[in-house]
Amino acid sequence: MDCKFEVELMEKIDSGDNRVTLYFSVPEGFTWEPSAHISLALEGYDENGEFHKDCVRKFSINTLMEENKIGITTRTDSSDSEYKKRIAKMQPGEKCTIIESGCRLPIRRENRGIVFISMGVGMSTVRPLINAIIKDSEKITSVTNICVNKTENYLYKDELGAADHIMCNSRFCHHRTDLRETIDSLNEVDKKIFYVVGSREFVQNMVVLLKEHGVAKEDIMIDKKPGILDGLYEGMSYDEIKKIVKAQKK
């Protein structure tokens, strides 16, 4: 959904391992669902009446509406990204603009278990989903959160640890071998709903792995545009999928 909301940076937190979390004000009239994404435009994105896409990036909102702030977390070590350099230098009081928002990962309440699989800052997308389910677990039988991170510094590790005794079982993996073993250990894998968030390669590998475990395409949720999951489930590359989607639009 296209929109235009000016937001002000309220707080900036160093989340370690070259990650920064930014909290922005909530503009009047702006609402969102758990796991929603926004396109955040920095100053100058529409300079001289032209749209400068290098001033815009898409982020998942890691907060719920009731927290009264819009939170995002991103890595800052992309040396080739001028955008990342600029956003990492932002200070409280500075402003930017939300120019698009949407949500591709609605919570499915089907009297089944839900498994979240994320890599690195992908946990930023999962956090609000878990917190929303803890608040209202109607028609959700269980929640398993599997997070892959190279170090012990997982996002929201303390928060998720506290949630474990409520209804969310969190498991942390250092590499993909651990992840495969963790998925192998799940009960009734083919009866659960899986949400996968991470890099393109990570999502692609997870879709293939889940298919190998008998998970139906309809039970895999990814934060990608329509048509991407269909191709990944059939073993296609992103380039192959892109060509098909492009041809369908003609």
Residue ranges of model-derived segments:
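Ferredoxin-reductase
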Residues: D2-E94, N149-T151
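FNR/FR-type flavoprotein reductase catalytic core
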Residues: C3, T73, S79-K250
